């Protein structure tokens, strides 16, 4: 019975996702020997760095290749026109590039099932008048050619004939956002998720008018000879949807970037430039197997990299350690920057090691940071509470829903360790994740700049690969 129902659902999804006017020619079965995924560079799409590859589309592509039991080959292109041409010429099997569903794309390609949703927003910089209408602009709009934003503007132009814009083929969305911040262009249009991610590094970005709401982000398949791949994609999507993978990736890439503090972001960027150089070597030395940037981000959240920081509750130093914790891990002077960093790293590592093995490696740091903030015992209380509510106690996306409940008597009176400021722990972890992302971006920018200065003759030609943007007591709190 279950198989029968699944077959019906699969058939329905296949019909719904096809939506292509091109007539199928005779389908020739083709067994993939590798999955060739065409993509664009971007922090939420596909990024490469010394720490490995990342991106929503990349992570999903890895899982899809595993599902198909074939090697994955990511093929980055410089613009959408090249991507489309490559798919039509069978140089790639699928496009996974953070693209939204549009009428034009439905006519040209087969569209996969929805991955997540975004709004299209008008972007401008801090200090410019807030536009109240698309006709109320004090400058030009610049967008990427062949993008969904061109389709949106074309539709708006029918109602507003005087609306004009510039299209560029030699820039990507990240570059246009940087040009907004640097006062090189006046306006652009971007997906809301892209703005949320990039304003961590470009705090002067502002999003105003919502031009399109709740657009599905999808993958693109060839309009013909793709029945087999589409069927496999739908079955894979159904499996990962039920497993919570889509929810996990949404939380991983977008869950911590929605909260934004303009003043704090600018202050952090200044501190990276003026304060961090004094302590970077200490973070790198004592991080051990941890990413030094996560350790540095935690320290900034704790003390703003002030070795003399003190709080009324008695915590002190760069990592704001309590006296009992300092004694436990062998720290004699909490106000000594190196001792504090060494102690904080040891304590954080201990929190990670204490966590159950059932928590995935990719999420252990967030559980450990919550333990660092409110204590391991309270995190265990929250995990048990999550399980009682039929949520996943090993998924950070579910734990962050439950932690604030530890402040409500209805819930904490049923726990072993009682009341805890769980909402503060969620804010604490999200803030560190934002600081960490910013540190990664700045670090990659610096490495890319140094590489360019050392090897100027090796710069890619205009026809070469696209550059990478941004290269992008243990039961008590400490």
Curated annotation (Swiss-Prot):
- Topology relative to the membrane, per the entry? Peripheral membrane protein
A GO cellular component annotated for this chain's UniProt record is: cell outer membrane
Q: Where is the active site?
A: 302
Subcellular localization(s) per the UniProt record: Cell outer membrane
Question: What's in the domain note?
Answer: The N-terminal domain does not have lytic activity and probably modulates enzymatic activity. The C-terminal domain is the catalytic active domain.
Q: Which family does it belong to?
A: In the N-terminal section; belongs to the bacterial solute-binding protein 3 family. In the C-terminal section; belongs to the transglycosylase Slt family.
Chain positions covered by the region annotation LT domain: 258-478
| Cell membrane keyword on record | no
Region Non-LT domain: which residues?
23-257
Do the record's keywords include Glycosyltransferase? no
- At the top level, the lineage of the source is Bacteria
Q: What is this protein called?
A: Membrane-bound lytic murein transglycosylase F
- Show the PANTHER family listed in the entry: MEMBRANE-BOUND LYTIC MUREIN TRANSGLYCOSYLASE F
Q: What is its EC number?
A: 4.2.2.n1
MF terms (GO), sorted A to Z: peptidoglycan lytic transglycosylase activity
Which EC class is this protein assigned?
A: lyase
Functionally, this protein is described as follows: Murein-degrading enzyme that degrades murein glycan strands and insoluble, high-molecular weight murein sacculi, with the concomitant formation of a 1,6-anhydromuramoyl product. Lytic transglycosylases (LTs) play an integral role in the metabolism of the peptidoglycan (PG) sacculus. Their lytic action creates space within the PG sacculus to allow for its expansion as well as for the insertion of various structures such as secretion systems and flagella.
Q: Which reaction does it catalyse?
A: Exolytic cleavage of the (1->4)-beta-glycosidic linkage between N-acetylmuramic acid (MurNAc) and N-acetylglucosamine (GlcNAc) residues in peptidoglycan, from either the reducing or the non-reducing ends of the peptidoglycan chains, with concomitant formation of a 1,6-anhydrobond in the MurNAc residue
HAMAP family associated with the record: MltF (MF_02016)
> What start and end residues bound the annotated signal peptide?
1-22
Q: Gene for this protein? A: mltF
Pfam families registered for this protein in UniProt: SBP_bac_3, SLT
Q: Which UniProt keywords apply?
A: Cell outer membrane, Cell wall biogenesis/degradation, Lyase, Membrane, Signal
Report biased composition (Acidic residues) as residue ranges. Answer: 451-461
Please list where the region (Disordered) is annotated.
Answer: 446-478
A Gene Ontology biological process in which this protein takes part is: peptidoglycan catabolic process
